[in-house]
From Swiss-Prot:
Its EC number is 7.1.1.-. It is found in: Cell inner membrane. The keyword Signal does not apply. This is NADH-quinone oxidoreductase subunit C/D. It comes from Buchnera aphidicola subsp. Schizaphis graminum (strain Sg). Its main location: membrane. NDH-1 shuttles electrons from NADH, via FMN and iron-sulfur (Fe-S) centers, to quinones in the respiratory chain. The immediate electron acceptor for the enzyme in this species is believed to be ubiquinone. Couples the redox reaction to proton translocation (for every two electrons transferred, four hydrogen ions are translocated across the cytoplasmic membrane), and thus conserves the redox energy in a proton gradient. One of its GO terms (molecular function) is NADH:ubiquinone reductase (non-electrogenic) activity.
């Protein structure tokens, strides 16, 4: 049940933040003047350093006691049109490196300023191998060159793409581009660009004894779980190497955020991981609320948790059943869709929509809970535990499934952290990293629940079993929401709550004007930066927002868990069979919209 004594503010004040952070060690080693410390709404240090110090600082952090051993994110910002840059280093562009120390439960954001005439910086791959894909995406989106990168080529965009889409002077709308024509010559060029050339990836076509076969799995193979291609280098049935090919589902979600108001971007968040629903909205609205300095009522926190856990169960059921189907059993898929229908009925009764409610708001939720919501939730809580046993008895205890998945595609905790793995893949290595416990948000510190973990090695079977246990924990959280739903408003009484409470709009002319402006132009959010991570359905999802004091975001960075999970595939599956790859893909739990954004 919700424990009032557990409620606490998890943020540090500025003095505690500086004393307890890594800054003290960095200043001692590099000197007081090696960086500029930026004051933001972010709960951990944000520093600017010269690019000549990047690898030295990275090595210091990754090798220090209680090291910063995960590169969580890496991307760029076009600084040229940013108005509010007081006390920041001169920069036309910047790159940021987000590092996490597991032992410290602490982060640091390192920024490197770059001038337009010198957009070169050293690659970070020697310290963190998962920097590879992040650097490729940053290059193609901003034109920043990473020296000594092994393969600085397009990853999201097509090979023939011209221009750098996330630069501020690149058109954001299709109507701002020239008319598109696909003549025969251009069609031939695009088809040729899809041809896989092993030499470009450091692969040999043959060795002394055998000619390798190169096989396309996808981009429309049913076991690829979306528009996803993997090119396999094969010696018979054995995978010598492989190259994941992503980007087929890219829709420019981060670019769209620069053309939508803070309020009108909420529906777009649902489509990032299209099975997650309200879970996707959570980090975005929390990050905006930090910028606006909005505290929401306790009832809002509980409602948000309740909807998030419903969507978590819904996503996990689809994952578990499709994994079982990939191994060869059909029945659980039909069970899952029956169970998921009950969840959708409950979600629809509360929000008015099913998969993509766009229901969270800046400062609250769209409307209050309807009459009878508790009856529907109670019925579901009585139904689901009994049904969950069928999945285990029908399939997960089946000796054939166990032999097909235990010990397959396995990796340890160190490897998981190197590749930026989060979610059940990391927890099955024995590390209980769940943001709901480690860095509680939306009142998660007030709930009693456990974090299921594995025995030290993550394999296909352990990953799916962790998800089953997580459903039981989500059911426990939902019971606490049902039992302890507070009374009170469903929106914060704050000038930047969008839209304002309806009852005030109808009585107060000032509030009506505010409503009109916030819905049409959007709320004006103070200039600052904020960051929010959450435990999403597939791992850690986060939003890093930069406000320049306007009605729209200056920069919205969306870090999704599926992106690094697919990058890890070659390191895990080399030397295995094609049939093992199919099981491995089913065990990752990804959708391509989450990868490509």
């Amino acid at each position: 049940m919700i424990d009032e004594n557990k409620k606490k503010n998890t943020n540090l004040n500025k003095n505690e933040y500086e004393e307890k952070s890594i800054l003290k060690d960095l200043f001692h080693f590099f000197g007081k003047d090696f960086c500029v410390v930026q004051d933001t709404c972010i709960d951990f240090p944000v520093i600017w350093i010269n690019k000549s110090l990047l690898l030295k600082v990275g090595k210091f952090l990754s090798s220090s006691p209680k090291p910063y051993n995960m590169l969580f994110d890496l991307h760029g910002v076009d600084e040229r049109f940013r108005l509010n840059r007081l006390n920041l280093p001169e920069a036309d562009f910047s790159i940021f490196y987000h590092l996490i120390s597991i032992e410290r439960n602490s982060d640091i954001l390192i920024k490197v300023p770059l001038l337009k005439d010198d957009l070169n910086v050293s690659t970070f791959i020697s310290l963190f191998p998962n920097a590879n894909w992040y650097e490729r995406e940053t290059w193609e989106m901003f034109g920043i060159i990473f020296d000594q990168h092994p393969n600085l080529t397009h990853i999201i965009m097509p090979n023939e793409w011209k221009g750098f889409p996330l630069r501020k002077d690149y058109p954001a709308r299709a109507t701002e581009h020239e008319s598109f024509f696909l003549d025969e010559q251009k069609e031939d060029l695009e088809m040729e660009n899809l041809r896989f050339k092993p030499e470009l990836w450091g692969m040999k076509r043959k060795n002394d004894n055998v000619d390798f076969m190169f096989l396309n799995l996808g981009p429309n193979h049913p076991s690829a779980h979306g528009a996803f291609r993997i090119v396999l280098q094969l010696d018979g049935e054995n995978i010598v190497d492989c190259v994941p090919d992503i980007g087929y589902h890219h829709r420019g979600a981060e670019k769209m955020a620069e053309r939508q108001s803070w309020h009108s971007y909420i529906p777009y968040t649902d489509r990032i991981e299209y099975l997650g629903g309200c879970v996707n909205e959570m980090p975005y609205v929390l990050a905006v609320e930090k910028l606006a300095n909005i505290s929401v009522p306790e009832k809002v926190e509980v409602i948000r948790v309740m909807l998030s856990e419903l969507f978590r169960i819904n996503s996990h059921l689809l994952y578990i059943s499709t994994f079982i189907q990939d191994v060869g059993c059909m029945t659980p898929v039909f069970l899952a869709f029956t169970d998921r229908q009950k969840i959708y009925d409950l979600i629809e009764a509360i929000t008015g929509a099913r998969m993509h409610p766009a229901w969270f708001r800046i400062g609250g939720v769209a409307h209050d809970l309807p009459k009878g919501w508790n009856v529907l939730l109670k019925e579901f809580l009585e139904w689901m535990p009994k049904r969950l046993k069928y999945y285990v008895q029908l399939a997960l205890e089946n000796p054939i499934l166990i032999r097909r998945s235990k010990g397959i595609a396995q990796y340890n905790q160190k490897e998981a952290l190197q590749w930026g793995v989060t979610g059940s893949g990391l927890r099955s290595t024995g590390l209980d990293l769940d943001v709901r416990k480690w860095r509680p948000y939306s009142g998660y510190q007030n709930y009693t629940f456990e974090i299921p973990i594995g025995q030290g090695i993550s394999d296909c079977y352990s990953r799916v079993i962790i998800k089953v246990e997580e459903i039981y924990q989500s059911l426990s959280i939902l019971k606490q929401c049902l039992k302890n739903m507070p009374e009170g408003p469903f929106k914060s009484d704050h000038p930047l709550t969008t839209p304002p409470p309806k009852e005030r709009v109808l009585k107060d002319i000032d509030t009506m004007i505010t409503h009109f402006l916030q819905v049409s132009w959007g709320p004006v959010i103070p200039a600052n930066e904020s960051f929010q991570m959450i435990e999403a359905t597939k791992g850690i999802n986060s939003y890093y927002l930069i406000s320049d004091g306007g009605t729209m975001s200056y920069r919205t960075r969306i870090r999704t868990p599926s992106f690094p999970h697919l990058q890890q595939i070659p390191s895990v599956i080399r030397g295995s069979l094609i049939s093992d790859l199919i099981v491995y893909l089913g065990s990752i739990d990804f959708v391509m919209s989450d990868v490509d954004r």
